[in-house]
C-alpha cells in the first residue's frame, strides 16, 4: 500500500445489499460508515429512501444521513466537502472510512473533484423555466442537443433541473457543460491515476449486485411494495402538507417520492403509481450499472453469494489495503 491512509468504497445498484455488507464489515474491521446517498441526506424521508432503521443507525452510525431538511438542496460539491471532512476525522482516530451507497455522481465528485462551473444566474434561470413552461421540456432538450450533445445524451428529456442547469451553464459562460468538464479532466490528469484520483487515500472500490439482473428486478419490485405497506404514501402525504415543499424540489424528485406525489396529486392511479415507481427504480439501477461498468479497478461481489464478507476481506488483504 502507498503512504496514503486506506478508504473503502462499497458501491452498487439500489436493492443490492450494500448496507448489510457494510454493517458486516464494521464488525470485523476498524471502519466507520459514511453514507453516499442523495436521498438519505433528508430528514423525514425514511421509508421511500430505504433509510436504515433508527435501531440500526443507533448501533451502526452513518455519517451524512439526516443532514438536510427536504426544503433544502444538497449538491455533489457539498457532499464532497462533507465527505472529505468526515474521512479526515475518521482517519485521525485510526479508523478506516467506509463509504457506502449508490449515488455514483457523489463518488465521482469525491475522486475527481468538480469542474469549476459558472454560478447560477437568476435571470437566465427564470427565462429557461419560463421556456420550459411555455414550450415543454422536449424543446429544452432539443436546444441542449444543439449546443451540448454529450450532456443531452446523458440527461433525460424529463429531467427539468439538469436540463435547465446545462443550458444555464452554456448561456452564462458561452461554453457547454461538457467543455467545462473536459477541461477539469485535463487538469486532473497530473493527479494520481486509478480509483483514488485526487483523494489523499488509497481507495479499495467494491461493487455488489446480483449476477442475475432478473433477481435484482424482483428485489426492486418487492421492496417498493414493502415500502407502500410500511406507510410510504402517508410519509409523502405528510411532506405534501408542508407549504414550503413542492414537486420541483430535488428531495421530492427522488425516485419513488415523485411517483407517490403525483398519485396524491391525482395524476396517477394507485396501480400506475406502483408500476411507475418500480420502473423508475429499475431505471436508476440501470444508470448505476452504467457508471460502475466504467469505474476503474472495481472488484465485483455477487449479492447472491453467502460468503461476501470473507470474499471482501480476502480481496482487501490481497491488495494490501489494510496493511
From Swiss-Prot:
It comes from the Bacteria. GO terms for molecular function: ATP binding; tRNA dimethylallyltransferase activity. Residues 37-40, 161-165 are annotated as: Interaction with substrate tRNA. Keywords: ATP-binding, Magnesium, Nucleotide-binding, Transferase, tRNA processing. Substrate binds at residues 14-19. The record marks 103, 125 as: Interaction with substrate tRNA. InterPro entries: Dimethylallyltransferase, IPT, P-loop_NTPase. It catalyses: adenosine(37) in tRNA + dimethylallyl diphosphate = N(6)-dimethylallyladenosine(37) in tRNA + diphosphate. Its EC number is 2.5.1.75. The keyword GTP-binding does not apply. GO terms for biological process: tRNA modification. Its cofactor is Mg(2+). Pfam families: IPPT. ATP binds at residues 12-19. Belongs to the IPP transferase family. HAMAP family: IPP_trans. Monomer. Catalyzes the transfer of a dimethylallyl group onto the adenine at position 37 in tRNAs that read codons beginning with uridine, leading to the formation of N6-(dimethylallyl)adenosine (i(6)A). This is tRNA dimethylallyltransferase. It comes from Pseudomonas putida (strain ATCC 700007 / DSM 6899 / JCM 31910 / BCRC 17059 / LMG 24140 / F1). The lineage of its organism: Bacteria, Pseudomonadati, Pseudomonadota, Gammaproteobacteria, Pseudomonadales. The gene is miaA.
